[in-house]
Amino acid sequence: MKFFALFIYRPVATILIAVAITLCGVLGFRLLPVAPLPQVDFPVIMISASLPGASPETMASSVATPLERSLGRIAGVNEMTSSSSLGSTRIILEFNFNRDINGAARDVQAAINAAQSLLPSGMPSRPTYRKANPSDAPIMILTLTSDTYSQGELYDFASTQLAQTIAQIDGVGDVDVGGSSLPAVRVGLNPEALFNQGVSLDDVRSAISNANVRKPQGAIEDSSHRWQIQTNDELKTAAEYQPLIIHYNNGAAVRLSDVASVTDSVQDVRNAGMTNAKPAILLMIRKLPEANIIQTVNSIRARLPELQETIPAAIDLQIAQDRSPTIRASLEEVEQTLVISIALVILVVFLFLRSGRATLIPAVAVPVSLIGTFAAMYLCGFSLNNLSLMALTIATGFVVDDAIVVLENISRHLEAGMKPLQASLQGTREVGFTVLSMSVSLVAVFLPLLLMGGLPGRLLREFAVTLSVAIGISLVISLTLTPMMCGWMLKRSKPHSQPRNKGFGRVLVAMQEGYGKSLKWVLNHTRIVGLVLVGTIALNVWMYITIPKTFFPEQDTGVLMGGIQADQSISFQAMRVKLQDFMKIIREDPAVDNVTGFTGGSRVNSGMMFITLKARGERNETAQQVIDRLRGKLAKEPGANLFLMAVQDIRVGGRQSNASYQYTLLSDDLAALREWEPKIRKALAAMPELADVNSDQQDNGAEMNLTYDRETMSRLGIDVAAANSLLNNAFGQRQISTIYQPMNQYKVVMEVDPRYTQDISALDKMYVINNDGKSIPLSYFASWQPANAPLSVNHQGLSAASTISFNLPTGSSLSEASDAINRTMTQLGVPSTVRGSFAGTAQVFQDTMNSQVILILAAIATVYIVLGILYESYVHPLTILSTLPSAGVGALLALELFDAPFSLIALIGIMLLIGIVKKNAIMMVDFALDAQRNGNMSPQDAIFQACILRFRPIMMTTLAALFGALPLVISSGDGSELRQPLGITIVGGLAMSQLLTLYTTPVVYLFFDRLRVRFSRKNRTTVTE
């Protein structure tokens, strides 16, 4: 009593405490960063290595494997995957959450250094690493276009100037430049001219390499001067290489221009990039795992004017894609939803109390509690994101509950004629323990979430802590500021002016009277209610087992990502046409605002596209509906497939794939993997629960298999090294020399001119100079025939791997897709040598599924323990928890009605319902226990009186929570697909719980009371005997 009086009789101090809480919250709000979701990125490091011209199998065995063995010793690695393709290897290391990315990077560099001696000597550079996840969608894409500069020159500006500067911006993890390659001098050899002049390809390579040398020449000095020696030992342009003498034939000089075309071009001509219908260079910017996307994008945008000034005016630098506008729009929608929730909650209070002064009290308590939470969020290092703001939106209904319970009880005393200050003190004392029990038990629900590990734990931690802090502040405000305001603002009511005798008050009285009559009947037919309660428990179990489930709601971020997969034998020229055709189809869709794409590099049969949709208000379709519409049109394009997926804020794993979810096949027997993967993929593609089924196993590429006749080679004076060198010089885009410039280094690339390699007959024109200086045709000692060969070789750990990717068709859930995959694997009878497991997001979903039931049971157990401690009883907590089954049925039924799968967001709703619906029972049980102990009432009279007197606050608190969540259900703007499952779960659970628990709680209370009496009699009988 003295504690409450301290605040009631000292209004100035109480007001100033509330003002201090508010000011701290305002300051915290201004300092909080903005993000789409809490920081849940796994630390990922990508290692890249290249050996131009090397086959995928060579890259896998000679480059990937040594690196993997060394990298595999690093502590804290969750997963290591690699992909080796023509001339390049990429290894992805995903670390656990506890690894610091910088410390992991140092370990990676040490592992690369340790493996260096095992790598091929012909690698043009050491392996490099980047602290970014290549499977993440870029946070921003910049494009460079020009009518004046070539693609190679644009690429040079992009990689040399722009990418270097952008990479230094805080938060940027990787800047990937695509669409072309660095400028280079290309030497296109004429095999017939070489044969006529008696010049070998090695002669040309040696001559060029020796003619372009950058070596120190020293200095000359006398007694007073010093001269640095400088020579013209470097050749920098094609024009300087053309007159280069590479051989003498019968005393006549053979110049490079006599046997080759020498042009200023690019290192790799098999690259193409486009933005809309125009050739372009793309800068794809990805953030560091721990970086804030909004802050990073803002920093990049702030540097763009400066970057534009560093490049010529004839180059147009544009932002083709930016992830931040949709994130900001989504957060603005949540903030609007929060405001609407506050308004609806206050309206509910006004309808029940019918007093402006009384309504003002919770109208003050709610914003003070919510604003004060921002200070704690800042101290905890949180951000303003969809989940934390959703927590505050839901908290609106919670924080007003405490104030409502106190306010309603004080109002009841005022209506009975008590003086305001006395009513405040008496009313607060009566419900102080009730409010404490409600708040503490509600916070207890979130303790298992705080202890939950992995990505779900990280994801839900901000939500749980934010909501718990809001509830804690609300508890303080409701026991200090609320009674003080009631004592000084409210007046003693007169009988004729009581709100319950007017308007809505009469409706409430009628409802209360009707409830009283129905409750009397229920208390006389408890067995029926008991059967209903048992039925709801069984229905909960059945509905949870059968309801479709997924990991996270499918978001509409306004960005689509597409992967092109063409025939494995397609040429680059044909692939470029496919890219243009696909882009044309997509550009014609009315929902599309911008499209960029690129193809080429080490995988000539694949490409990537990034599509920006129009703002949500400018299109009628969701991102998934746009994909469904485009899927039919894209399927008509022969010889290639374009797989589209909506970019999500959460993507787990480092695998680059053409779909959202992955299933990985592993085997130590590569032949078995290559045999079974097509069978499994074909079977899965026929399943209606999956869409866009594709695989990264590409082992049907066209290969020309040369077989050397070693005896003939020995007789002709030719060794294998010379023959291999011939092939590399001719067809490997071999980098044979380096041109040093102040800003960058460029290569001299040699190959047979593409005009002479249009078909297999090009091999007939190849000659090797033997030990006697004679030109020997390749066909003299080698035979060849076409064969199939892999375009890529993939590993997971040290095992051969193949990842099957898939999307979900409209109406299908991830649980249904998972069941279909497991069923298919069983039906096919896949041997034990081929192991299958889900990967990435699908794997996290499996882990979450296994822990969901345990998490819910842990929350219930935690609440039981807390309530048992508060009530010093084993029985009363069970009475209070008997409200949960009806809420579960309501939540699951609502999800079914809205055709929404059970996701991690819906799980949050279930956890919240555990905390919300027990409040009704707490108010009933508290009053009934007090009536039994202090009012000498029978258990039945006590619980009946408790139900009647607590009817109004129960209705107020339930409707406040329900209306607080209602805006989440009806929201339709950006990010609504993330909010709706939470609102649907809470509204459905509250509605069903309110309907049933008003009757089941008193019945359960009486059941346990009779059970207690029966055991007490048995114990007394035993003692007497």
UniProtKB/Swiss-Prot annotation:
Pfam families: ACR_tran (PF00873)
Keywords carried by this UniProt record: Cell inner membrane, Cell membrane, Membrane, Transmembrane, Transmembrane helix, Transport
Record-linked InterPro entries: AcrB_DN_DC_subdom, Acrflvin-R, Multidrug-R_MdtC
Keyword Ribonucleoprotein in annotation: no
GO molecular function, one term: xenobiotic transmembrane transporter activity
Gene name for this UniProt entry: mdtC
Family recorded in the similarity comment: Belongs to the resistance-nodulation-cell division (RND) (TC 2.A.6) family. MdtC subfamily.
Membrane topology according to the record: Multi-pass membrane protein
One GO CC term, this protein: plasma membrane
Quaternary structure note: Part of a tripartite efflux system composed of MdtA, MdtB and MdtC. MdtC forms a heteromultimer with MdtB.
PANTHER family associated with the record: MULTIDRUG RESISTANCE PROTEIN MDTC (PTHR32063:SF34), PTHR32063
Subcellular location as annotated: Cell inner membrane
Transmembrane segments: 3-23, 333-353, 360-380, 387-407, 431-451, 463-483, 528-548, 853-873, 875-895, 897-917, 953-973, 984-1004
NCBIfam families assigned to the protein according to its UniProt record, in alphabetical order: PRK10614.1, RND_permease_2
Protein name: Multidrug resistance protein MdtC
